[in-house]
Design a protein with these regions (language model features):
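Transmembrane beta-strand segments that form the barrel wall of outer-membrane beta-barrel proteins
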Residues: 168-174
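N-terminal periplasmic accessory domains that precede
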Residues: 18, 24-48, 151-153
């Protein structure tokens, strides 16, 4: 918790090893947390921060891309040349009917070359393309202003024999993309107690809970969520105002006839952000206890024990309409010589992938520390200790195809 930091120091090499043992031989970073400033009173600290991030600059020229008008002019000039080549029309038809990625201008020139539209209609379409701005419309629908909210409450008190610190921190991040966010809550308690002149005890408990929602794995991420990979002049909307589907790389194009039994792989980014969602939930608890025995002047002994539990559940739900589910169904669909279609995965439903990991960790350490100065100029520092550590991590992973969330209720 950055709000609870008093100071940060770096100890290198011998200085670190002298205090923290051989495992710190390469140096350590010491983070000192805050304590109460006045004895007998309770310090209350509260802070609230709101960070507003600047919206992404989606201007083509500012990002070193051709503007929509420049792209239209350049591609149109190329297509005028391309039509003079041998077999141009046949090659264009093959690209379209076989599902290759083609641009709107490519398809318009194919229609013009095959006599389906006139030169006047072609010029009219090109003029309309020059007024489009795909990246701008994409940003208006997919991005929103990123807001980061942070709240911190700290209660601290101290006396001659004890000190107590309780710190609670909450963070919410809307993550810029629609249907994405992060909630993060931590609570920390630390207490130090002088049980006797020769004994000091320190205990601490730290709890963390986080819940994050983001876009699940998308095989066509660049084609759906990277506007710079698509023509700048491409319409973001259909004529009826709905969002136009995009096609990229292996997903075909909007002009071909999808083979019987297979699913069209066009996607629009707004729907995909709702149809394919990954959630990550984490719960972490850490407990620590430390006893310091003051044996004689300059000689102390420490016994420390810490135990940590970390549970993480990651779940990706791509529903039936998501691109991921459609890609899976197409990939495992076969057609025999007679044209019969066979589905090797469920025909309906989506995908649910779940990963659970559970970590348990403990550290037990005993250490003797000696530090003294003789004759006001000879410093003697020595440590001897023994440490036991265990790290245990296990988990499960599952994949369900044909998953329908409505049937689970």
């Amino acid at each position: 918790n950055p709000y609870d930091i008093q100071s940060v120091n770096v100890l290198k090499d011998a200085a670190a090893a002298a205090i923290y043992g051989a495992r710190a031989a390469n140096g350590i970073i010491v983070v000192t947390t805050k304590n109460a400033t006045k004895k007998g009173k309770v310090d209350i600290d509260f802070s609230a921060n709101l960070t507003v991030y600047e919206n992404k600059n989606m201007d083509y020229a500012d990002n070193f891309y051709m503007t929509p008008a420049q792209q239209v002019d350049t591609e149109a000039k190329y297509m005028e040349y391309y039509l003079t080549r041998d077999n141009a029309l046949d090659n264009m038809k093959k690209s379209i009917t076989e599902g290759s990625q083609v641009t709107p201008i490519y398809y318009d020139y194919y229609q013009f070359a095959s006599g389906k539209i006139s030169r006047q209609e072609l010029d009219s379409r090109l003029a309309k393309y020059r007024t489009n701005n795909y990246a701008r419309d994409f940003a208006d629908n997919v991005y929103h202003t990123r807001l980061l909210q942070q709240y911190n409450l700290a209660l601290r008190n101290s006396s001659d024999v004890s000190s107590n610190n309780l710190v609670v921190n909450y963070k919410h991040d809307n993550a810029e993309l629609i249907n994405n966010d992060l909630d993060w809550l931590t609570a920390y308690y630390k207490g130090s107690f002088e049980l006797a002149k020769w004994l000091k005890a320190t205990v601490s408990v730290n709890g963390l809970y986080s819940d994050q929602k983001s876009l699940g794995y998308n095989a066509n991420y660049r084609g759906s969520f990277d506007p710079w990979t698509l023509p700048a002049y491409m319409p973001f909307y259909n004529e009826d105002g709905s969002i136009r589907k995009t096609y990229y790389w292996f997903t075909g194009n909007e002009y071909w006839d999808v083979p019987n039994g297979f699913h069209d792989l066009g996607t629009d980014p707004v729907s995909e952000l709702k149809n394919n969602v990954k959630t990550n939930t984490r719960q972490n608890m850490r407990y620590m206890a430390d006893l310091e025995f003051r044996i004689i002047k300059g000689l102390t002994a420490n016994a420390m024990f810490s135990y940590e539990i970390d549970n993480v559940e990651e779940q990706t739900h791509a529903n039936e309409k998501s691109l991921t589910s459609r890609v899976i169904r197409n990939a495992y669909t076969t057609v025999d010589a007679a044209g019969r279609v066979k589905y090797n995965t469920p025909e309906n439903g989506g995908m649910l992938q779940t990963t659970n990991t559970k970590g348990k960790y403990y550290t037990l350490r005993g250490q003797l520390n000696y530090s003294n100065t003789f004759f006001k100029k000879h410093d003697v520092v020595a440590i001897a200790g023994l440490e036991f550590r265990e790290t245990k991590l296990n988990g499960t992973k599952s994949l369900v195809l044909g998953y329908d969330e409505q049937l689970q209720n």
